[in-house]
């Protein structure tokens, strides 16, 4: 019930493993707002939050602005600072705090969700080791599940991201993204 009343939600996460990039998620229609608040290395955007069950998705579906940010590793002080800075930027952006943060502009790569990758069996595997947001050329084959092959079936490069290393049936193994900038 509380989520239905939110104008803005900032969902902050850290991860147990080492991470080299900060990642934000937002609705494409709030792109400028998101860039100002999150200042991440990578910003993932989508226009369709109908299916996802996250706080970010729920708030976006219900007319608010839902933002998510992966700040870094649990054990890294950088993650705590990044979370704090995201909160401060949000409060400044909403005119709830008068503070000069004196930050440098950050180059943010922006990717739009294109397609989720679903395994059919536990035999699903990537054909090589990929880094998050590896570029896939048109028609490039990147995974296999018994006889089924997974490839970039478009005429433009796509980017493989949020890569999972353990197969869980009915759950995604990653996403293909379009690079917007």
Give each language-model segment a name.
Residues 1-181:
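Structured catalytic-domain cores with a bias toward divalent-metal coordination
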